[in-house]
Design a protein with these regions (language model features):
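Interfacial "coupling" helices/loops that link adjacent transmembrane helices in transporter permeases
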Residues: 355-399, 481, 771-810, 817, ...
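Membrane-proximal juxtamembrane linkers immediately C-terminal to transmembrane helices
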Residues: 114-137, 156-160, 198, 261, ...
Length: 880
C-alpha cells in the first residue's frame, strides 16, 4: 500500500511540477537563510556565512535535483518529454506532418471500414449466446441431412446438449394486411433451446407442437411484428394464413434473433411418418449446442463414426454419405461473402503496408535533414536507445493522428456503403443493419495505429541513430549524405510500393473488366423490355400437379392479354440471377455413374414453351417445348450446347436420353429434343455450366417466376400485373416485381462495388507509390546536385545528366515489375475462380496496366531529373 501511495504521489508530481518546484525552492531558501543567520550570530561576515551555509547544505541546485529524482518517475517523465518534443517537431514541419497523417489516415481508415464490414457480415449476423458452442451438422459441403438421419443423430448423439432441425423457405403470409412473401423457417420444438434464446413476448414452441395436427402456431421476428403489426401486443393470439393454412401467433423473438438469417417468422417442423423414415431426401439443416465438456473434434469424431454405421446399415442411401460438424458461424457464412470479405481484408491490409512504407520513406528523407540535431543531442549525452525512442514516439504520434482522421474516413466509407447500397442487397445480405463503428472497431483502429507507427518508424529510427556525432556535425558537406544501406532500404520500400500498386491495379482492372463483360452479356437478352415477378405456390393449397398447371395456364393467359405484352413465360431462374439456380446430378443412358460422387451435374431449369423466345435464348438444334409435351407423354428435355458437346462429342445429342438424379434413383429417362445456347445463370461460375431444361407441363413444381416481354416500359405494367395475379388467387402475393435489367443489376451490384473499391484502393496505392518515386528521386537529385554541376562543367550533355538522374527510378520500376507481375498473375488466378469473364492471362490488362503504371512512375521521376539538367555549373564549382 505504501509503495502504491508513493507511486501515485510520483505520478501526481508529473502534473504539478512547476508548483512543486516553487515549493522546493522556497523551502531550500528558508533553510539557507536559517543557516546564514546562525553563521552571522557566530561572528562570520555575510559573505563567509553564506558560503559556509551553502557548503553545509551540499549545494542548493544539487539538492533540488536529488529531491526531484526521488519524487519522479524517470521513465514516464522522459516519455512525456519525448511526446512534447515530438509534438513540437511535427508542428515545426507542417508539410511533412500533413502528408504523413493523410497517408496513414487513408490506410488505417479503409482497414477500419472493411474490418467493420467483416465483423457485420461474418460475426454479428449470429447474435446468439455462447456462440462458440453452437455447431451445424452436415453431410459434407454444407449439404443438408435426411429426416431419418436427423432422428438418428438426435437419439444417438452424446455430444450435444440439444439438437434441432430446420427447413427454411419463402412463405406466403396473408391476413392483417396485403398478401406478402416472407422468409420463414420450419423448426423442431427444441430449436430455440439449442440456440439459447427465447421470445421476448409470448412463448416458444412446446414439446409436441412439432407433430402433425398440432403445428398451427407461429412465432414472429421482431422486425415483422413491428412492420406488419405495428408492434401491437394484441396481435399475439390472432390468426394469420401462412401458405394457405391458419396459424396462431404465439410469440415475438428478440430483435437480435434472425437465425437462419434473415428469417421473418418460425413455424413448427412437423415431420410426417413417411418423412421420418426417408433417408433419400436431404432436406433438413441441423443445429446443435455442444455440452460444456465436449470439444468440436470430439463431436466430429462421434458423427463420423455414426455416419459409417448408417452407411453400413443403409448402403442404398448412405453409402457415400459422411457427417461433418462445423462451427455455426462457419456454416452460415456464404462462401462468396467470405471470399470477397477476405479478399478485401487482404487488399486493405496491403494498402496499409504501402502507406507505412511511404511514411517510412518520408521519415528517411526527414531524418537526413535532422542529422545535425541528432548529433547535437548525442553530443550532450543522449544514447542511441533514447534517440530511437524519440523518433519512434514521433512516428506513433503521426499514426495516432492518422487513426483519428482515419476513423472519420471509415465512418464516411461505411455511410457511403450503407446509404448507396440498393435495398435488395441490404435485405439479402444479413449484417447490413449491423454495420457500425463499435468498441471492437475502435480497438482495431488503435492497434492498427500502434502497429503502423512502429512499422513506419522503426527502420528510419534505427538507421538514423547509427550515424556518428562527427558525421552529423559536418552538416552541409558531402559527408552529410546518407549511407548506401539507407539508400538501398529506401529504394526497397519504393520498389515494394510500386509492386503492390501493380498487383492492386491489375486485380481491380480484371474485376471491373469481368463485371462489364458479365453485365454486357445480359444485353443479349434485351432485359430492359422484360418484367419479371415471383409467385410461390404453397403445397398446402396447390398439392396436385394439375392444380399448379392450371394456375400457370391461367396466369400466362391473363398476362398475355395485358396491353403492350408481346410474350409471357414461366421459368425457375433468370440469367445472372445468382439466386435461384439449382444444380443436380443426372445420368446418361449407357454411362450410368458407379456412385453419386462420380455422377455428372448440371444446372436444372424448368421453363414454359415461350421462355426461349422471351429471353432471346437461341435454339441451336432440334425443337422447343410445345403444349403437346404433357405429363402423360414422353418425358423430354432441352440441353445446353456445353452439355451436348461434353457428353456426346462428335455426334448429335438429339434423341439421346438422360435421367435426373443419382445412380440409385429411378426417375424417368428424358429424351433430348433440342440444344440451346449456353446461358450463365449463376455469375459466380467462371463459365456457363451445363444446363438441362424441363418443360413446365412435366415439372410444374420447380417454376416460381413469370416474365412478360413488353413493347414499352415494363414498369408501367406493374399494377396491372399484380391485379391479374390477385384475380386468380387473392391470397397469393406477386413479389420482386421489377424489370429484368434492374433485377440483374441488383444481383451483380455487390461485385461491381467490390471492383470499384479495389479500383479506388489501387489508385490510392498508385498515388502513394508515385509520391514515393518522386520523393526518392528528388532526394537523390538533391544529394547529387553538385556532382551534376561538375559533370556539366566538364562537358556532359543535358541528355547524359537526365539519364544519370532518372536511371535510379527506372531501375526501381524494373525491379517492381519483376516482383509485381508474377504476384499479379497469381492474384488473377484467384479472381478467375470468383467471377465469370475474368481471365488470369488477359493480354489487355497485363499489357495496359504496366504501361500506365510505368508512365506514371516515369512522370514522377522526370520532374526531379529534369531539374538536375538545370544545375548551374559555376555554383557547383564554387562549392567544390
Amino acid at each position: 500500500m505504501n509503495r502504491f501511495r508513493a507511486w501515485l504521489f510520483r505520478l501526481g508530481e508529473l502534473f504539478q511540477k512547476e508548483r512543486r518546484d516553487r515549493d522546493l525552492s522556497a523551502e531550500m531558501d528558508s533553510h539557507l537563510q536559517l543557516h546564514i543567520e546562525d553563521n552571522l550570530h557566530a561572528g562570520m561576515s555575510r559573505a563567509e556565512a553564506q558560503r559556509q551555509a551553502l557548503i553545509k547544505l551540499g549545494g542548493v541546485e544539487q539538492t533540488k535535483e536529488m529531491v526531484r529524482d526521488l519524487r519522479a518517475l524517470p521513465l514516464l517523465e522522459s516519455l512525456l518529454q519525448d511526446i512534447r518534443y515530438g509534438v513540437r517537431m511535427l508542428l515545426k514541419n507542417p508539410g511533412f506532418t500533413f502528408v504523413a497523417v493523410l497517408t496513414l489516415a487513408l490506410g488505417i481508415g479503409v482497414n477500419t471500414a472493411v474490418y467493420s464490414l467483416a465483423e457485420a457480415f461474418l460475426v454479428r449476423p449470429l447474435s446468439l449466446p455462447n456462440l462458440h458452442r453452437l455447431v451445424a451438422i452436415t453431410t459434407g459441403q454444407k449439404s443438408p441431412v435426411a429426416a431419418a438421419d436427423y432422428l438418428d443423430c438426435k437419439t444417438q448423439g452424446q455430444s450435444f446438449e440439444q439438437l434441432a432441425a430446420y427447413r427454411a423457405s419463402d412463405m406466403n403470409l396473408t391476413g392483417s394486411g396485403e398478401p406478402e412473401r416472407v422468409y420463414g423457417a420450419a423448426v423442431t420444438a427444441g430449436f430455440f433451446t439449442a440456440l439459447g434464446v427465447a421470445p421476448v413476448r409470448g412463448r416458444g414452441f412446446l414439446i409436441g407442437e412439432d407433430e402433425p395436427g398440432h403445428d398451427q402456431v407461429a412465432i414472429l421476428s421482431y422486425r415483422l411484428w413491428q412492420r406488419r403489426f405495428g408492434a401491437d401486443p394484441v396481435a399475439l393470439g390472432k390468426t394469420v394464413n401462412i401458405d394457405g393454412k391458419p396459424y396462431t401467433m404465439i410469440g415475438v423473438m428478440d430483435r437480435s434473433v434472425e437465425f437462419p438469417v434473415p428469417t421473418d417468422l418460425w413455424i413448427p417442423l412437423a415431420l410426417s411418418p413417411k418423412e421420418k423414415v426417408n433417408r433419400a431426401a436431404n432436406s433438413l439443416h441441423l443445429v446443435a449446442r455442444l455440452k460444456d465438456n465436449v470439444s468440436l473434434s470430439t463431436a466430429r469424431a462421434e458423427m463420423t463414426l455414426l455416419g459409417r454405421q448408417l452407411a453400413d446399415a443403409y448402403p442404398n442411401t448412405n453409402k457415400d454419405r459422411q457427417f461433418d460438424v462445423l462451427p455455426l458461424v462457419e456454416y452460415v457464412e456464404g462462401s462468396i461473402t467470405r471470399a470477397y470479405t477476405v479478399l478485401m481484408l487482404a487488399v486493405v491490409g496491403i494498402v496499409l503496408l504501402v502507406a507505412c512504407a511511404n511514411v517510412a520513406n518520408l521519415q528517411f528523407t526527414r531524418a537526413s535533414s535532422r542529422r545535425s540535431e541528432l548529433a547535437i543531442r548525442e553530443a550532450f549525452g543522449a544514447g542511441r536507445a533514447r534517440l530511437v525512442r524519440q523518433m519512434l514516439t514521433e512516428s506513433i504520434l503521426l499514426a495516432l493522428l492518422g487513426a483519428a482522421a482515419g476513423l472519420l474516413f471509415a465512418k464516411f466509407c461505411l455511410w457511403l456503403c450503407v446509404s448507396k447500397m440498393p435495398p435488395y442487397v441490404v435485405r439479402l445480405w444479413a449484417g447490413f443493419d449491423k454495420i457500425r463503428l463499435d468498441a471492437g472497431a475502435l480497438f482495431f483502429t488503435m492497434a492498427a495505429a500502434l502497429i503502423s507507427g512502429i512499422l513506419a518508424g522503426i527502420l528510419p529510427a534505427v538507421a538514423s541513430s547509427k550515424h556518428h556525432t562527427t558525421d552529423g556535425l559536418r552538416e552541409g558537406g558531402r559527408g552529410a549524405t546518407v549511407g548506401r544501406g539507407t539508400r538501398r532500404l529506401r529504394s526497397a520500400f519504393v520498389t515494394a510500393q510500386v509492386a503492390v500498386a501493380l498487383v492492386l491495379v491489375v486485380g481491380a482492372a480484371l474485376l471491373i473488366k469481368g463485371f462489364r463483360q458479365m453485365t454486357g452479356s445480359a444485353e443479349a437478352y434485351s432485359p430492359e423490355r422484360v418484367l419479371i415477378l415471383g409467385v410461390n405456390l404453397p403445397a398446402s393449397k396447390y398439392p396436385q400437379t394439375g392444380e399448379r398447371l392450371a394456375f400457370y395456364r391461367k396466369a400466362l393467359a391473363d398476362l398475355s392479354s395485358l396491353p403492350g405484352a408481346q410474350s409471357v413465360a414461366a421459368f425457375s431462374c433468370y440469367p445472372l440471377s445468382n439466386n435461384g439456380a439449382i444444380w443436380g446430378y443426372f445420368q446418361v443412358l449407357g454411362r450410368v455413374a458407379p456412385d453419386l460422387r462420380h455422377s455428372p451435374w448440371a444446372d436444372m431449369q424448368t421453363i414454359s414453351p415461350e421462355y426461349l423466345g422471351l429471353m432471346h435464348v437461341a435454339l441451336l438444334a432440334g425443337r422447343e417445348f410445345t403444349s403437346d409435351d404433357r405429363e402423360a407423354t414422353q418425358p423430354v428435355a432441352l440441353v445446353s450446347q456445353k452439355l451436348a458437346q461434353r457428353y456426346w462429342p462428335g455426334e448429335s445429342a438429339l434423341g439421346k436420353q438422360i435421367r435426373i438424379g443419382g445412380p440409385a434413383d429411378s426417375g424417368p429417362w428424358l429424351t433430348v429434343v433440342g440444344i440451346t445456347a449456353d446461358v450463365l445463370y449463376d455469375w459466380t461460375n467462371q463459365v456457363p455450366p451445363p444446363t438441362i431444361y424441363r418443360p413446365l407441363t412435366q415439372a410444374p413444381q420447380a417454376a416460381s417466376l413469370l416474365g412478360i416481354r413488353t413493347v414499352g416500359d415494363p414498369a408501367s405494367l406493374g399494377q396491372a400485373t399484380r391485379a391479374r395475379i390477385a384475380s386468380i388467387d387473392p391470397e397469393l402475393p406477386a413479389f420482386d416485381l421489377k424489370p429484368l435489367d434492374v433485377a440483374i443489376h441488383e444481383s451483380t451490384v455487390g461485385l461491381g462495388y467490390t471492383g470499384a473499391m479495389m479500383g479506388i484502393l489501387g489508385l490510392i496505392a498508385l498515388a502513394v507509390a508515385v509520391v514515393g518515386i518522386y520523393g526518392i528521386m528528388a532526394y537523390t537529385v538533391g544529394e547529387r546536385t553538385n556532382e551534376f554541376g561538375v559533370r556539366i562543367a566538364m562537358g556532359a550533355q543535358r541528355e547524359d545528366i537526365l539519364w544519370l538522374a532518372s536511371r535510379h527510378g527506372l531501375l526501381i520500376s524494373a525491379a517492381a515489375f519483376a516482383i509485381g507481375l508474377p504476384a499479379a498473375i497469381a492474384g488473377a488466378r484467384f479472381l478467375a475462380g470468383l467471377i465469370y469473364g475474368t481471365s488470369p492471362g488477359d493480354p489487355v490488362v497485363f499489357a495496359g496496366v504496366p504501361i500506365i503504371l510505368f508512365a506514371a512512375v516515369l512522370t514522377a521521376g522526370y520532374i526531379p531529373a529534369h531539374r538536375a539538367t538545370r544545375v548551374d555549373p559555376l555554383a557547383a564549382l564554387r562549392y567544390e
